[in-house]
Every structure is written in structure tokens, then in C-alpha cells.
């Protein structure tokens, strides 16, 4: 795996793009407007500079990470990736549309992941021709500082897809926990709500 596409240059997408680039991956950061993409890359640069200032990152590492990030508004170009991570609005209709589009644009080997924290992966994957290569990949805010990632299997998600994604998580310094079946709120949110209710 060499190239990661992140769809959505908001708070979560920017964080995911940052840790992927810092982990050595080439990153395509895509959003609907160039202004949003430029703002996202600017935020990543500021975040990395803060890490340099705190001696958590060298200037050379910062420059190398930034050089790996490419911004675009072209959805078709975004399909040239080994892993696509969708981080857009938490709306099922929007996510279904994006996954259908990416399914038609990406090579057959590409894994498609959603950063959703609650929505059904099985339903998101239903209109694609690669449900075995679709999973939930729930990062936590702020992404560069939170080590946990929930990997959520849909009904047809292949074990190989999970294995490849776990390897990616490890390389970017994340601890992954696998949910073998979907449940509302996944693992973390269910645990937090249970504690709050207690």
C-alpha cells in the first residue's frame, strides 16, 4: 500500500491525512472546493510546525510529510489510491453516493473505508461491487493525538481487508480494535454512553 486518498478536508479528514503522510504514505486530500483543500493543507502545516516547535518532529520530517500530500477537487483523480478513507458529513445518502462513485473510479484492489461513527457499513457497501473491500474506519478527534481506531466489519467485509487496514493503522501509530459485527455507536460510543448512564 502506497497511496491513501482522504475524502473531506474538514477537521477529521485533515487529521487523517496528516497522520498518513507522517507515516510515510502518499496522500491525496480531496474536497469539493479548492479553498477547502488549501485550508486543510494549511492546517496540516500548522499542526506539523507545532510538533517541530515541541521537538516531537524534525523540520526534515515535516517537509517530507508535506511533500507527500497532494490536494485536489477532482474525484476521478482521487480514485488512484490503494485505500480511500471517506470523512464527509454523517449522512447515509451522501456516503452511499460517494461509495458508489469511488467503486466505479478505483482499481479493483482498492479498499474503501468510512470514518463514520454510527452508520451501517453493510448499508453503505450495498450499492457497490466490492462489499468485501469496504469497512468502517472510525478515527477519534483530534486524530494526531488519539491512538484508537475502530475497524468495523460489514456483513461481507473480508478478513484480508481487515488485516491490510490493521497494518496501515500500525504504521501510522494507531491501535486498532476490530468489531466483527456492527452495533449502534460501535464500541467506544457504547462504552462511554454506558458509563454516562451509570
Question: Which role does the model predict for each range below?
Answer:
Residues 96-148, 153-166:
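Rossmann-fold NAD(P)-binding glycine/threonine-rich loop
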Residues 35-46, 64, 94, 160-171, ...:
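A non-catalytic, amphipathic alpha-helix used as a structural packing/dimerization or gating element
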Residues 1-50, 54, 70:
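NAD(P)+-binding Rossmann beta1-loop-alpha1 motif at the extreme N-terminus of oxidoreductases
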Residues 25, 130, 151-182, 193-198:
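Internal alpha-helical scaffold of NAD(P)-dependent oxidoreductase catalytic cores
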Residues 35-39, 50-112, 118-120:
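Rossmann-like NAD(P)-binding element
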Residues 28, 70, 85, 135-137, ...:
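Hydrophobic/aromatic beta-strand patches that form the interior of the parallel beta-sheet core
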Amino acid at each position: 500500500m502506497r497511496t491513501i486518498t482522504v475524502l473531506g478536508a474538514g477537521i477529521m479528514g485533515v487529521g487523517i491525512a496528516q497522520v498518513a503522510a507522517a507515516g510515510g504514505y502518499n496522500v491525496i486530500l480531496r474536497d469539493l472546493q479548492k479553498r477547502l483543500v488549501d485550508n486543510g493543507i494549511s492546517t496540516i502545516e500548522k499542526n506539523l510546525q507545532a510538533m517541530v516547535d515541541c521537538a516531537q518532529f524534525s523540520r526534515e520530517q515535516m517537509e517530507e510529510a508535506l511533500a507527500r500530500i497532494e490536494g485536489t477537487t477532482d474525484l476521478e483523480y482521487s480514485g488512484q489510491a490503494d485505500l480511500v478513507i471517506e470523512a464527509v458529513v454523517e449522512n447515509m445518502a451522501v456516503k452511499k453516493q460517494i461509495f458508489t462513485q469511488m467503486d466505479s473510479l478505483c482499481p479493483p484492489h482498492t479498499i474503501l473505508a468510512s470514518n463514520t461513527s454510527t452508520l451501517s457499513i453493510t448499508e453503505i457497501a450495498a450499492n457497490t461491487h466490492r462489499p468485501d473491500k469496504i469497512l468502517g474506519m472510525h478515527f477519534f478527534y483530534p486524530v494526531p493525538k488519539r491512538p484508537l481506531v475502530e475497524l468495523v466489519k460489514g456483513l461481507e467485509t473480508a478478513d484480508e481487508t481487515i488485516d491490510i487496514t490493521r497494518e496501515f493503522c500500525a504504521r501510522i501509530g494507531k491501535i486498532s480494535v476490530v468489531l466483527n459485527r456492527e452495533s449502534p455507536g460501535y464500541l467506544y460510543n457504547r462504552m462511554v454512553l454506558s458509563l454516562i448512564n451509570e
